[in-house]
UniProtKB/Swiss-Prot annotation:
Function: Pyrophosphatase that catalyzes the hydrolysis of nucleoside triphosphates to their monophosphate derivatives, with a high preference for the non-canonical purine nucleotides XTP (xanthosine triphosphate), dITP (deoxyinosine triphosphate) and ITP. Seems to function as a house-cleaning enzyme that removes non-canonical purine nucleotides from the nucleotide pool, thus preventing their incorporation into DNA/RNA and avoiding chromosomal lesions.
Record Gene3D superfamilies: 3.90.950.10
GO molecular function, one term: ribonucleoside triphosphate phosphatase activity
Binding site for substrate: T8, N9, N10, K11, N12, K13, S73, F157, G158, Y159, D160, K180, H185, R186
Ligand binding (Mg(2+)): D72
Active site residues according to the UniProt entry: D72 (proton acceptor)
Domain of life of the native organism: Bacteria
Protein name as catalogued: dITP/XTP pyrophosphatase
EC number: 3.6.1.66
Cofactor: binding comment: Binds 1 Mg(2+) ion per subunit.
UniProt keyword Ribonucleoprotein, yes or no: no
Organism the protein comes from: Lactobacillus johnsonii (strain CNCM I-12250 / La1 / NCC 533)
Record GO cellular component, one term: cytosol
Length: 207
């Protein structure tokens, strides 16, 4: 096989992976759910990032009969017992509404001092081969930081304006794309995936 399905509707994410694979001389065509006819909607009912990534990868690999990459990411705040966690995208009550999500996060942390606002951004990536779900390739990435009391930066995506990385002295939203990718949870998980995918892929094809 020379096609990888990325279980997402985000073409930019698929393009990012395809370009990265070309750079390591593993030129696989990456498509998304938008390239399929009537793809199923997968409910993310898992209680962990790994469970949700596996749900999406398995369902879409089964539907498409293609090797499938799925990911799940989120923010876990220590003071909130790990919330928003797997509910990060819809924490404010409406899916992918960054303003509502950030407003709720700030409200939940109202009055909490800076030294108690630690948090972790997490990404899990899973690649599944059709009919071989016991052989999933799994990579993960994490980065620690803290939640500010007000947003900073122009990169207005998700919780990035509130997530401050002390070692860099910046929020994710204040970093360039390259700066963020070099240290981010997603960047870590993707680099691990790229390191392992060619060998795993060939093994799946030959068994």
């Amino acid at each position: 096989m020379d096609t990888l399905l990325f279980a997402t509707n985000n073409k930019n994410k698929a393009r990012e992976v395809e370009e990265a694979l070309k750079k390591i001389n593993f030129p696989i065509h990456v498509i998304t759910n938008q390239d399929l006819t009537d793809p199923p909607h997968v409910l993310e009912t898992g209680t962990t990032f790994l469970a949700n990534a596996k749900l999406k990868a398995h369902k879409m690999a089964e539907f498409s009969n293609l090797p499938t990459l799925a990911d799940d990411s989120g923010l876990s705040v220590d003071k909130l017992n790990g919330a928003p966690g797997v509910h990060s995208a819809r924490y404010g009550g409406e899916a992918h509404n960054d303003a509502l999500n950030n407003a709720k996060l700030l409200a939940e942390l109202g009055g909490v001092p800076r030294e108690k606002r630690q948090a972790t951004f997490h990404t899990t990536m899973v690649v599944s081969w059709p009919g071989r779900f016991d052989d999933d390739l799994v990579t993960q990435g994490e980065i620690r930081g803290e939640i500010l009391t007000y947003p900073r930066g122009d990169g207005d995506f998700g919780y990035d304006p509130l997530f401050f990385v002390p070692d860099k002295g910046k929020t994710f939203a204040e970093m360039t794309v390259d700066e963020k990718n070099a240290i981010s949870h997603r960047g870590q998980a993707l680099r691990k995936l790229l390191a392992e995918l060619p060998t795993w892929w060939k093994k799946m094809e030959n068994e």
